């Protein structure tokens, strides 16, 4: 086939899923001439699994993407059909937004944003090879002979790399939702020295909502006063569509047990490792044999369709078994399948080959983001895509990469876990993975990250102005509460305390200090603030942050002290050219891991599996010796 030069760019993004969209938009918005390529322009921002954005830890990621100037939060706010705040019975660290998406509208809106973005070209093409010369990216080739030149490349191919669809005895090469897999590109990555592994994920059947008996299920409506993912979005006032909760039965489980011999998962057909936190229904029935039922959520796929997603029933069982199994669920005895569930195997890049910037350690200008890095979930993908797009643009400009620490954001935790620790199964973001989760709440993502987004040029004037206005309101509100006092003789406060079964006052106290009591809320006390100035236009999120800062002040101070100690180790930098073979006393395993991972700091080195506390002590002594031998050169503060 005749090759021709089809174009020259600063950054090329391969794949237009959730990672690719964020990467391309970030790169273009930072001024880099960018091209995004996808197998099909119809699969842009596709949701091949659940029709939802957010949830525990994932909602935090979406808020952080938005605070930095990313797109996902804005798009889901415009296209959601339901939104709920989860975990409200727990502390604020784990409060999380989750939205049901109209999948097609979400795609159309993201396509509109991409097509109208300055500095961004879009192209439908099958990329077959990555061109690397002298250890640096030079461009890519497509199956039609087009060569696109660029010094930076972001690969966001999701589950398409050598994808294989599996439904019972049927298995064939394919990507999600019937799209083509990317086979030649996987071979090209191996040829240039990228280490690949094999993972598996799956999805449940989609069913016709007209054949579901919702009267036998429990309705799950959206919040009456829904919050937004984006700090820029107006309040959501559109009509919401409910989800429905039902359960499997003992009959369901018996059907599955009777057909385990036909399950690819248990017949040895599936080679890839599956996700721990999203197991198939057959896996759940085997692992939790004592459970008589499992929750099943019926979720609408959009406003103008009868297609419903059966959350909790991911499977690769044969289609005839899927039909029988689904019809044994409460309220689904007459259900009809629109699309069967399936498993998909795919290649992924071992993320320990990457720097914290998501650039490959050995191939300059090669970035990867999303499920190709071993993660699961749209939100994890989008977060990586944003950071890879930012750093690809900065790479082209010769600027230092943007790296968020574990104490900065869930995004920092996500990337540090992948690069430093690696993963042997599809990685899912969890609040429990974040050591400093009380500081990394979803409500304060803008306070943590918008200034960073502004400093690199991704946060525009409108967003920054809105952020500064909110910060000013918050400061004023805290001052107002700290300067408003009540005394034991105040009948209004006594009535409130009696109603809330709170201890009476014994001395004068500010309303801010009174708000520390767990049984009292902002809304309870606002009528007393400055003689009842309750009509001030206070943003509900500002009110929430005032309450959190009062109630959790002691814990926040303690956690900040932990962060300060953490940052001391993070700030002890390890030279990029450090020869660990010359550092005497390191354990053999520790030396091997340090050579392979190339940590940038003592803090990162301490999180590598196989590097012991003794190894860290030896590194600290070595760095101090080097500092004394060469004062002012490569020293450690």
UniProtKB/Swiss-Prot annotation:
GO biological process: tRNA methylation; tRNA wobble uridine modification
Key word tRNA processing present: yes
PROSITE patterns reported in the protein's UniProt record: GIDA_1, GIDA_2
InterPro entries linked to this entry: FAD/NAD-bd_sf, GIDA_C_N, MnmG, MnmG-rel, MnmG-rel_CS, MnmG_C, MnmG_C_subdom, MnmG_C_subdom_sf
Pfam family, one: SAM_GIDA_C
Needed co-factor(s): FAD
Keyword terms of this UniProt record: Cytoplasm, FAD, Flavoprotein, NAD, tRNA processing
Disulfide bonds: none
First-listed, main subcellular location of the protein, grouped into a coarse class: cytoplasm
HAMAP family according to UniProt: MnmG_GidA
Protein name as annotated: tRNA uridine 5-carboxymethylaminomethyl modification enzyme MnmG
Source organism of this protein record: Heliobacterium modesticaldum (strain ATCC 51547 / Ice1)
């Amino acid at each position: 086939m005749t090759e021709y030069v089809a174009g020259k760019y600063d950054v090329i993004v391969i794949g237009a899923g959730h990672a690719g969209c964020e990467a391309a938009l970030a790169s273009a918005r930072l001024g880099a001439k960018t091209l995004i390529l996808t197998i099909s322009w119809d699969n842009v921002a596709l949701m091949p699994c659940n029709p939802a954005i957010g949830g525990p830890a994932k909602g935090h990621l979406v808020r952080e993407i938005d605070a930095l100037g990313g797109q996902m939060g804005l798009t889901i706010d415009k296209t959601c059909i339901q939104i709920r705040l989860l975990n409200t019975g727990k502390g604020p660290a784990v409060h999380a937004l989750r939205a049901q998406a109209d999948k097609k509208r979400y795609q159309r809106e993201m396509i509109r944003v991409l097509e109208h973005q300055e500095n961004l070209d879009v192209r439908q093409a099958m990329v077959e090879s990555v061109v690397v010369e002298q250890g640096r990216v030079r461009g890519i080739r497509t199956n039609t002979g087009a060569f696109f030149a660029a010094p930076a490349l972001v690969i966001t191919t999701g589950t398409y790399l050598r994808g294989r669809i599996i439904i019972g005895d049927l298995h064939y090469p394919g990507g999600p939702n019937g799209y083509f897999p990317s086979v030649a590109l996987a071979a090209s990555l191996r040829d240039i020295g990228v280490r690949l592994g094999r993972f598996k994920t799956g999805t449940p059947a989609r069913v016709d909502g007209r054949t579901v008996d919702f009267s036998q299920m429990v309705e799950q409506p959206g919040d009456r006063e829904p919050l937004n993912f984006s700090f820029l979005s107006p309040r959501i006032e559109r009509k919401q569509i409910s989800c429905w909760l039902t359960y499997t039965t003992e009959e369901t489980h018996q059907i599955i047990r009777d057909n385990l011999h036909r399950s690819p998962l248990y017949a040895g057909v599936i080679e890839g490792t599956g996700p721990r936190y999203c197991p198939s229904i057959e896996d759940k029935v085997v692992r939790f044999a004592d459970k008589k039922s499992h929750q099943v959520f019926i979720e609408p796929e959009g406003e103008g369709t009868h297609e419903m997603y059966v959350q909790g029933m991911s499977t690769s069982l044969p289609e005839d078994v899927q039909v029988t199994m689904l019809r044994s669920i409460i309220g689904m005895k007459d259900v009809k399948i629109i699309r069967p569930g399936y498993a998909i195997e795919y290649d992924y890049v071992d993320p320990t080959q990457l720097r914290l910037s998501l650039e490959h350690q050995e191939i300059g200008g090669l970035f990867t983001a999303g499920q190709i890095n071993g993660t699961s979930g749209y939100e994890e993908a989008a977060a990586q895509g944003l950071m890879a797009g930012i750093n690809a643009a900065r790479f082209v400009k010769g600027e230092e990469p943007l790296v968020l620490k574990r104490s900065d954001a869930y995004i920092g935790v996500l990337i540090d876990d992948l690069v430093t620790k690696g993963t042997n199964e599809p990685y899912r973001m969890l609040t429990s993975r974040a050591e400093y989760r009380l500081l990394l709440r979803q409500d304060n993502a803008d306070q943590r990250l918008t200034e960073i987004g502004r400093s690199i040029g991704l946060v525009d004037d409108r967003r920054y102005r809105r952020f500064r206005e909110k910060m000013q309101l918050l400061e004023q509100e805290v001052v107002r509460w700290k300067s408003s006092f009540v005394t034991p003789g105040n009948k209004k406060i006594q009535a409130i305390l009696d109603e809330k079964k709170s201890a009476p006052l014994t001395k004068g106290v500010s309303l801010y200090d009174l708000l520390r009591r767990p049984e009292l809320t902002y809304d309870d006390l606002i009528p007393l603030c400055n003689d009842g100035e309750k009509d001030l236009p206070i943003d509900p999120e500002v009110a929430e942050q005032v309450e959190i800062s009062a109630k959790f002040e002691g814990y926040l101070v303690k956690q900040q002290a932990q962060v300060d100690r953490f940052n001391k180790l993070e700030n002890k930098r390890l030279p990029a050219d450090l020869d660990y073979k010359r550092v005497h006393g390191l354990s053999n395993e520790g030396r091997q891991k340090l050579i392979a991972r190339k940590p940038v700091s003592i803090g990162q080195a301490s999180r590598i599996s196989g590097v012991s506390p003794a190894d860290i002590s030896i590194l600290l002594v070595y760095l101090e010796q080097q500092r004394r031998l060469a004062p002012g050169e490569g020293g450690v503060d």
